Amino acid sequence: RRHSFPTRRSSDLIDKDYSNLNQIIEDMFETMYNAEGIGLAAPQVGKNIRLVVIDAKSMSEDFPGEDMENFKLVLINPIIEEEFGDDFTFREGCLSLPLVSDEITRPSKIIVTYFDRDWNLQEKEFSGVKARIIQHECDHLDGKLWIDRLSPIKRKLIQSKLQKISKAQVYHKYQMKFAGK
């Protein structure tokens, strides 16, 4: 599977008749697992649709109190309705930007509405690391990356790494497709 440099535009809503949706979901999980990720948004694999897959089981030892073992979701057309709670700072990285990470501050709780894989409408509250993962992936759907949340100084500090990524001059375990390449 090719892993795309994400588009920087808002993704489109989809409906139940979207072509090959179940196969796209399976392919996204496979791509995410092969890259040793915990979440993947459709724009990262070249699909400009509002679709996210998450499986954070690999984080269960690092966050024993958050039940990461069972945190596996498919979010179709997710919308973060509300962000609230104390600010929560956490080191974020991304499959789209290999070898780059930094501390990002976000609200600690969210309310998100989405359709699950069976097209049941869900409205749920998430907190802590679970909220963080959903916020990060939903940013992709809105054409944003975690680096957009950095201060100008911090962004300047990683600029050379970002340029290497955009020129395909970085080593990573998974195949990527670069914009303009």
Q: Residue locations for each model-derived region?
A:
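Single conserved hydrophobic/aromatic residue that forms the stacking wall/gate
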Residues: 1-7
